[in-house]
Amino acid sequence: WALENEPEMEKVWFADKEKLLAILRLYMGVGAKRRRKDFMYAKQIFELISFFFDGESGERDEFRLADDEVKAILNDYLAAYDHNDDNSMWFNKLKEIADKNGYASDMKAYKANPENFKGNVSDIAEAVRIAVTGRANTPDLWTIVHIMGEEQMTERIKKHIK
């Protein structure tokens, strides 16, 4: 499909076959409890994964937080980020960023008293997710960052801090 319909992008998409396979496993749910069955044709898949490839441009979701909030969160994220952290350690750092910036790291506390917080840790994750992928909804962000690589992730976040 790619060679016939997107010949200029085929070389980009298939340049690193292991990366492409990791992306497809993530998006198709290979090895997961439930596999995706909603893709009707290849173009849908490549539209969803286009953000992995530099030079790809597409529609970006808007940040729901104010610009100064986003910049503070992204600066804290880059300062705390360690590519060697496992998913649990990484998420705990997101919780620390939430606490530092006035967001709830504990969803029970947030649900009990939402007025005490600017938002919750999911707002922190969403800001990072949009900066990295351009989308508010994606599969597991930690996995995306590890497939993408630290350098590409950092470059994308720094674009939003300027």
Task: Describe each PLM feature range.
Residues 1-162:
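Conserved nucleotide- and phosphate/pyrophosphate-binding catalytic cores
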